[in-house]
Amino acid sequence: MFEGVPDEDAWRNCTTLEGACELTARWLEGSLSYVPGYTAPQYAGENGPLSEALAAINRLGFLTDDSQPGKDVSGGNGQRAFVTGRCTEQAAAVISAVLVETDLVVLVFPPGEGGSGQICVTLDGEREFTWLGGSGGPSYAHETYTDWTNETLAKALKECWELQIFDPVWGRNAKLIPLLQKALITAKS
């Protein structure tokens, strides 16, 4: 799928969640230089194990659109590990069911619904810098993907469930990714 097609054309021709997940995985691995909504020519996050794990999560059917590793709070700076993205209703239900038995937090936004909460996940010099809990709802996904890809993919992603998953423990990285992968493997079986 999409072999030999220029990166932006691959996205313009992509029409499904599964295709978007595969293209995002390739971008995370560095074999694509373009992903919708991201203006840098390549993934600017943590390279190596984190980008590999995020690629695997995409290939399991969870279209990641934002993430960060955890960093211990020191000198007023710190991060909670998080991953946000979109998936099918079935995957959202399984992820929620698997992770509810852990101390990870899963915020779920069904298609057509937004949110306006604020949960701090990044401290910068003792001030809150990044938050989860808010969602642009279906119009955000539709506008973003219509502008950068095509109407068919935008409509498909508009029907997906949006999840924001984070570890409430500042600096911890050992739980979120493995448990999300476990939940997605369960959803696939």
Label every PLM stretch briefly.
Residues 61-67, 103-111:
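Short secondary-structure junctions
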Residues 86-93:
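Helix N-cap motif at beta-to-alpha junctions
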Residues 93-103:
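Short, aromatic/basic amphipathic alpha-helical patches
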Residues 75-82, 115-119:
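Ankyrin-repeat boundary/"N-cap" motif
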Residues 13, 105-189:
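Active-site or metal-binding loop neighborhoods of secreted/extracellular toxin and effector enzymes
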Residues 1-79:
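N-terminal low-complexity, intrinsically disordered segments
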Residues 44, 83-86:
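Short coil/turn segments at secondary-structure boundaries
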